[in-house]
Amino acid sequence: MKLTVSMITMNEEKAVAKVIQDIRRVAPDAEVLLVDSSKDRTAEIAQELGARVIKQFPPQGYGPAMDRAVREASGDVVITLDCDDTYPVEVIPEMVRLVEQEGFDLVNTTRTWRRPQAMPFANFLANRLFALGARVLHGLKTTDVHSGMRAYRKTMIDKVQWVAKGPALPVDMYVVPHRMGFRIKEIPIDYRERIGETTLHRWSSTVWTFKRLWNARKVK
């Protein structure tokens, strides 16, 4: 199976080279795809390292960027990854194996199977609360609905429609396939300190998350 590692970026010039080099180390033949809305040298650095870059400027937000990043991937398996060095690329081969050999359509990594030292306690509690909402409303046994690292079977992506707006798209990208009956696996990872500054607006993300968890009940 061909592999694409898709990332959305905004001013990640401090981390992008390391992240791409780490990806090449564990998946040398993978397509690395960035949907980029940066004002710094993120896109230039990525292209120098052989990545395919789609410019999205002015920025349209997390949801539309991530939707484009997975839908324009050329691989049979699409790995999503935050470009800030917080996720362990070493698990990519295992994620691909779970899709290719074990038949899963989506592999979610969970940062919050225990409290990570790199995550503020308030964020940890919020993520566990979101996960509880997914369990109660959708019967989804998870500890992390907002993980930035997942593996998707591309044929599944092509069959699923989600609301591609707002910062809570990861919720739809997890809950909707579950409600449609696709095979899902969750594996624990160790979450690390990020390189650079976060662009996440926590209050907006919280509101969107609960809104999407509630509205996704309509999916069958």
Where are these regions (language model features)?
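Acceptor/aglycone-binding surface of glycosyltransferases and processive sugar-polymer synthases
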Residues: 57-72, 89-167, 193-214, 218
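Catalytic donor-sugar/metal-binding loop of nucleotide-sugar-dependent glycosyltransferases
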Residues: 141, 165, 175-192
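A conserved acidic beta->alpha catalytic loop
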Residues: 36-43
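The conserved acidic donor/metal-binding loop of glycosyltransferases
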Residues: 82-87
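Short, well-formed alpha-helical segments that are part of the catalytic scaffolds
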Residues: 11-25
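Donor nucleotide-sugar binding loop of glycosyltransferases
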Residues: 12-15, 38, 88
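Short aromatic/hydrophobic "clamp" motif used to bind/position activated sugar donors
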Residues: 78
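Cell-envelope/extracellular polymer assembly enzymes that use nucleotide-activated donors
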Residues: 2-4, 31
